[in-house]
């Protein structure tokens, strides 16, 4: 079976680029894949360049008739996914919906093309007067945009994409349940895949990053947004007043938000900014505890969370959205309510004081990711679903088939 796969690749800095640069090599065991990327850049991953046919997407010359299926990886970043949206609207196919809420995508699209009337019509088409109000608020910088509020999940603006989808792949029950009542075509949940683990020298990593080898290292990684709860996290860790704690934040601060939360007196904070993937994994591997909160959610899944769990770290997460899908024994869940800060303090204190508990949570996290999110299992599920959509015999998804793939 031959497919055309549309996805950003590095150096386009999105989690979806990283996701596919690992998944591609497993998926090609089952499918013949041509990659279609945005015009104007060259992928930096040498292995991807060497092993796959990569084409810039040119609307005037693209011919879908040479493929059994078209697979579109859709996210909320217009810069990375704008060309994918345009291709999907012209040539419907199977959509991997990485983000449930696409309000930010359309706002960036309007900002890029300046067509406010089109943007307003789209909002009004799906949400009536409320949609028109959402569109008008974009022009008022003093108003909180919809994608930074809890109301975003009620007005996701994904309908336009779903109308062009022949079938949909999602990564959480949260998104599947939100979509399935109004979407009457095939939909399947496939877990985000685990990432290949590397071996790091803990003390060397800490030395290279300027972190004391004896520090209690807590880390958060990924893009810095308001919904990552850094204001609450920093306040909670500061109130613990534990000089052994070093908190490292690694990620691009697009809105320069962290400056609003600093001024803490009792906490050793290191801000690393954007790190390349190797350094990011090294930081996680050298950490004692990880924090990955997110509220309100846009329905996204977190590759950062799977990396943290895969490396056997106890992780504090928000008990909402896709994070709530994880078993209680594999992560430490915190409700996004008035007690959020107190539970951060309580969990961190318990993890520091009870080494056996800390180790057990990390081990269960790693086991869950290893068993339920193996890249071999996820690739088999992708290929089987796509073959079924193309009226081809689906693949066997069994433990034996997964183990056989690991040896290939």
Where would I find each of the regions flagged by the language model?
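Glycosyltransferase donor-sugar binding loop
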Residues: 40-41, 221, 246-259
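Conserved donor-binding/catalytic core segment of Leloir-type glycosyltransferases
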Residues: 5, 169, 212-228, 234-237
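A short, active-site helix/loop in glycosyltransferases that binds the activated sugar's phosphate group
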Residues: 146-187, 194-196
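Nucleotide-activated donor-binding/catalytic signature segment of Leloir-type glycosyltransferases, i.e.
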Residues: 258-281
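Short hydrophobic beta-strand element within catalytic cores of glycosyltransferases
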Residues: 310, 314-317
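A short, well-ordered alpha-helix in the C-terminal region of glycosyltransferases
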Residues: 207, 350, 357-372, 378-384
């Amino acid at each position: 079976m031959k497919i055309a796969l549309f996805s950003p690749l590095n150096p386009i800095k999105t989690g979806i680029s990283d996701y596919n640069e690992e998944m591609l090599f497993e998926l090609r065991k089952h499918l013949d894949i041509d990659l279609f990327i945005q015009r104007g850049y060259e992928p930096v991953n040498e292995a991807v360049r060497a092993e796959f046919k990569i084409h810039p997407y040119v609307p005037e010359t693209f011919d879908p008739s040479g493929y059994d299926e078209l697979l579109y990886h859709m996210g909320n970043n217009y810069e990375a996914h704008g060309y994918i949206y345009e291709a999907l609207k012209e040539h419907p196919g199977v959509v991997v919906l990485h983000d449930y809420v696409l309000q930010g995508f359309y706002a960036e699209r309007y900002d890029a093309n300046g067509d406010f009337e089109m943007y307003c019509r789209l909002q009004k088409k799906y949400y009536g007067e409320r949609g028109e109000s959402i569109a008008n608020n974009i022009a008022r910088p003093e108003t909180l945009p919809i994608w930074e509020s809890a109301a975003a999940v009620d007005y996701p603006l994904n309908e336009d994409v779903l109308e062009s989808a022949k079938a949909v792949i999602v990564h959480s029950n949260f998104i599947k349940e939100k979509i399935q009542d109004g979407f009457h075509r095939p939909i399947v949940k496939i877990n985000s895949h685990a990432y290949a683990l590397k071996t790091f020298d803990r003390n060397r990593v800490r030395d290279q990053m300027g972190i004391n080898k004896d520090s209690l290292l807590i880390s958060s990684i990924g893009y810095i947004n308001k919904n990552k709860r850094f204001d609450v996290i920093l306040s909670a860790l500061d109130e613990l007043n534990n000089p052994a704690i070093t908190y490292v934040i690694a990620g691009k601060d697009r809105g320069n938000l962290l400056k609003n939360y600093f001024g803490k007196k009792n906490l050793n904070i290191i801000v690393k900014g954007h790190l390349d993937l190797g350094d990011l994994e090294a930081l996680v591997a050298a950490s004692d505890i990880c924090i990955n909160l997110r509220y309100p959610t846009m329905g996204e899944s977190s590759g950062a969370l799977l990396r943290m769990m895969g490396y056997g770290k106890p992780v504090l997460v928000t008990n909402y959205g896709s994070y709530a899908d994880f078993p209680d024994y594999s992560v430490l869940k915190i409700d996004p309510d008035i007690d959020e800060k107190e539970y951060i303090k309580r969990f961190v204190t318990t993890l520091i004081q009870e080494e056996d508990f800390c180790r057990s949570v990390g081990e269960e996290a790693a086991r869950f990711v290893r068993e339920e999110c193996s890249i071999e299992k996820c690739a088999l599920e992708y290929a089987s679903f796509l073959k079924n959509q193309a009226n081809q015999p689906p693949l066997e998804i069994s433990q034996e088939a997964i183990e056989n793939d690991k040896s290939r």
